[in-house]
């Protein structure tokens, strides 16, 4: 029996984001295959996760492509909050969808400092949510993604993208 990535908790999210980053750099899902790199399978077939379909991957990929050129990283606190809200409150994206309900505003109030600058960048990047169609079969997907993203925001993994502890310490110039 094949072990599913979601059973590992937020590690499935890490793999998903890494895949999306790789996929956006290469130009599309047809450039990479799950077997040997010979363009044999598409996004929908690479991930055997129940409820995860191509529209979910595409939506996350669009979010990542919009934040990266503006010096925002998906691991930043504000970016995590926005991604969680975007994936969790799909009523803003899909008001006609029967499986979602209305939620509060997608962006928090403005705050001073670095966090305020990040919020301003995100507010400029996402003035209105893009319309993406979701059917009843994808309702489960939004809830799972939202739950995992909320868990990642609350309990981020330490050390994955961080610099090694020796970087910047005790450097000797030649």
Curated annotation (Swiss-Prot):
Gene Ontology CC terms, in alphabetical order: cytoplasmic vesicle; endoplasmic reticulum; Golgi apparatus
Domain of life: Eukaryota
Cystine crosslinks: none
SMART domains recorded: RESP18
Annotated signal peptide: 1-29
Stated role: May play an important regulatory role in corticotrophs.
Protein family membership: Belongs to the RESP18 family.
PANTHER family (alphabetical): REGULATED ENDOCRINE SPECIFIC PROTEIN 18, REGULATED ENDOCRINE-SPECIFIC PROTEIN 18
Protein name as annotated: Regulated endocrine-specific protein 18
Species the sequence originates in: Bos taurus (Bovine)
The organism's taxonomic lineage, starting at the top: Eukaryota, Metazoa, Chordata, Craniata, Vertebrata
